[in-house]
A protein has these predicted regions:
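Short, low-complexity N-terminal intrinsically disordered segments enriched in polar/charged residues
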Residues: 1-22, 26
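Eukaryotic intrinsically disordered and solvent-exposed regulatory patches
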Residues: 5, 18, 28-29, 72-75, ...
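Hydrophobic pocket/interface hotspot
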Residues: 20, 31-32, 55, 108
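Eukaryotic basic, amphipathic alpha-helical target segments in cytosolic regions
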Residues: 21-28, 40, 44, 63-67, ...
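A solvent-exposed, acidic/Ser-Thr-rich amphipathic alpha-helical stretch
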Residues: 29-30, 38-82
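Intrinsically disordered, low-complexity regions enriched in proline, serine, glycine
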Residues: 33-34, 44-45, 53, 67-71, ...
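A short hydrophobic beta-strand element
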Residues: 80-92
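Short beta-strand edge/turn micro-motifs at domain boundaries
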Residues: 87, 95-134
Length: 134
């Protein structure tokens, strides 16, 4: 199979997205930590978390009881070093809050026959537009 075979990297990326958000929404988020490489980095709303332990603390320490992600779309592409870049767009609803738009980007790399996440960037789609002085 050719690395740039569209079906291959699309399937890997789509399977990752489906599994990640299913785990995040429906089960113990501690299971997500197994997807991250030892030295992985997560940036959550501008705050950096380095390493699996720090990422586990962030993912399991969220203040909500329930959450549901609705994936609007995603883009998946291979990189020159045979990794996979995944960009996800959607909405999330936590507890009784109104739905919010979100964007999340994952870098997936092959390691010992499995795919691991080395980089994860999450941002809510909230715009902080300054009000002009009158």
């Amino acid at each position: 199979m050719q690395w740039c075979d569209n079906d291959y990297f699309q399937k890997v990326g789509e399977d990752f997205v489906q599994w990640y958000y299913n785990q995040f929404d429906n089960t113990n988020r501690m299971e997500l930590v197994n997807l991250y490489a030892e030295g992985a980095t997560l940036t959550w709303e501008g705050t950096l978390f380095s390493g699996r332990e720090a990422i586990a603390g962030k993912l399991t320490g969220m203040p909500f009881q329930q959450i549901k992600h609705i994936i609007t779309d995603h883009d998946i592409q291979p990189t020159l070093d045979k990794s996979i870049l995944v960009m996800v767009f959607g909405q999330l609803k936590a507890d009784n809050d109104l739905p919010l738009a979100f964007h999340q980007v994952f870098m997936l790399k092959p390691l010992n026959g499995n795919w691991v996440c080395t980089n994860d960037v999450f941002r809510l789609g909230v715009h902080n537009i300054p009000v002009e002085a009158q």
